[in-house]
Amino acid sequence: EETFREKSDGPTVETREIKNEKNLSKIHFGDVFAVTYTGKLSVYTNGVNYNVPVRETLFDEGMDVVDFFKGLAPVLGDENKTLIVYGKKDFAYAVSDYGVEIKCKTQDVSLIKYLVDYTERKETFDDVIISKGYNPFTPAYDLFLLYDELYSVLVAQDMKSLYEKVELPLSDILYDMERYGFKADVPALKRLSAEYAAEAETLTKKIYELSGEVFNINSPKQLGEVLFGKMAIGKGKKNAGGYSTTAEVLEKYADRHEIIKYILRYRKVQKFKSTYVEGFLAVADKNTGLIHTRFNQTI
């Protein structure tokens, strides 16, 4: 049987269910409130945990996610309130999709946990509350407890300044960078792609000419057999898949045969073209040329 922990220095939390926008609007929010939005919609404030069933169909009781976030808009827009969430940046994405702006102060428990209880693995909020034995039926209250617990450790370890002056502001900066994106010069990238393609073709012909054989240059096995077998440019280093043809190995034989410099250049050109040039072109918005990436602050 699973056991769940309640706050040891306070009463068992009162739990209520919110099934519509009208009831949500009647919540009296204190100066501090916690919100969970992944898995279960839940709000905790003034000693009460409010669970919000998500309406899946027109006939279900509960609220749509959009109505939940819009119902929170007034308190999220109150600069005198403090919001506790697990993942400030992700929460900002979630509410902004519905036109809701966050102006209240925000505490990000995921960042605090990253600083004081780093585990080297990706953990969701649900993972954390289960591992700590919190009650999964009061998620927002659990979040409040987790904040209370970890923030005390943060202060004790003298990392409050790091959290408030570096990590929290950085989260906002990363969010803005992700939303605005990076401008890519698409025409220039396309020209560069064509130039690299032409150079790769020229290098391929030169390599075939010097080796006296047509083969797959991108195949380490075939390349090794040509260089160390047919051409015998050196003894080579064999492994289970054949001869090793890493850059480090090939550079040792650069003075043995001019084919090596062409192979090394061919690899660089292919790497630049496929990984960077084509990679950027694949993710750049076709209309704006902007590249929108995601930054993970807690790894």
Where are these regions (language model features)?
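Charged catalytic and DNA/RNA-contacting regions of genome-maintenance
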Residues: 44-46, 52, 60, 67-153, ...
